[in-house]
Amino acid sequence: MASQSTDQPKSIHDFIVKDARGNDVDLSIYKGKVLLIVNVASQCGLTNSNYPELTKLYEQYKDKGLEILAFPCNQFGNQEPGDNEQIMEFACTRFKAEFPIFDKVDVNGSNAAPVYKYLKSSKGGLFGDGIKWNFTKFLVDRDGKVVDRYAPTTSPASIEKDIKKLIGTS
């Protein structure tokens, strides 16, 4: 949900989302951080490649200003059927994910989470704004502006050079 102002959100920092435990998280806490925002799923063919690479990127760059924000989504092939507790256990136990995992959201349609409406309007995809599948990635700069959007099949490791540019270690 956007902040209480009637203005259009100007950055990702203008949103409040729910974490996996149902608590409000004001995304302004990430001001000054580079964000990689990903819609994740536990039972997708891309899961076994994406989660380990996301974890590696996070371990490598979290102290340099990177945060990875994972939003579970069940809109693609019902590949995220579990509840938030099951999703967190899966990601944190199987893949040792230490990055924040948020409440399950819709990324498309009339019930799409406002933060995803903003991401899509900032960086449309090759075939329009809609998210096509799990593990679509958005790279956001330290000011909360969407810099790039990556297809589900783009590996997190291949985004490393873009992350390094934004955090200033290229």
Curated annotation (Swiss-Prot):
Swiss-Prot/TrEMBL keywords: Cytoplasm, Oxidoreductase, Peroxidase
Enzyme Commission designation: 1.11.1.12
GO terms assigned for molecular function: phospholipid-hydroperoxide glutathione peroxidase activity
Classification via Pfam families: GSHPx
Biological process annotations from GO: response to oxidative stress
Active site (record annotation): C44
Catalytic reaction list: a hydroperoxy polyunsaturated fatty acid + 2 glutathione = a hydroxy polyunsaturated fatty acid + glutathione disulfide + H2O
Gene Ontology cellular-component annotations: cytosol
Subcellular location: Cytoplasm
Major enzyme class: oxidoreductase
InterPro entries hit by this protein: Glutathione_peroxidase, GPX_AS, GPX_CS, Thioredoxin-like_sf, Thioredoxin_domain
CDD domains the record matches: GSH_Peroxidase
Lineage: superkingdom: Eukaryota
Function: Protects cells and enzymes from oxidative damage, by catalyzing the reduction of hydrogen peroxide, lipid peroxides and organic hydroperoxide, by glutathione.
Family: Belongs to the glutathione peroxidase family.
Name of the molecule in the record: Probable phospholipid hydroperoxide glutathione peroxidase
Species, as recorded: Mesembryanthemum crystallinum (Common ice plant)
Species lineage: Eukaryota, Viridiplantae, Streptophyta, Embryophyta, Tracheophyta
Gene name in the database record: GPXMC1
